[in-house]
Amino acid sequence: MMNYEIFKEVVKEKFMDYMPEKFKGMELVVEPVEKVNVTLDGIILREEGRNISPTIYINDMYKKYQNCGDLEETLMAACDFMERAYEQAPVVDV
């Protein structure tokens, strides 16, 4: 089983491979996100002309990976969640 840092690098490399074709032109960005007393590693997808994106936390993905032991299952579930969340996110003009 991979440690967290290796897992994070693999997720950065492979995440977009599991996203549907319509997301392929987007930029995957991993950024630290400050929460109460903790910093999490967030994934967002940037699309030109869109100012808002859902965030998925690699930390949560790693917990799922530790429980199931299956990287592909973990990535598929995260990408499915991202797709649904992205489609429900409002378009905000700034």
Where are these regions (language model features)?
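Amphipathic alpha-helical interaction modules
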Residues: 19-58
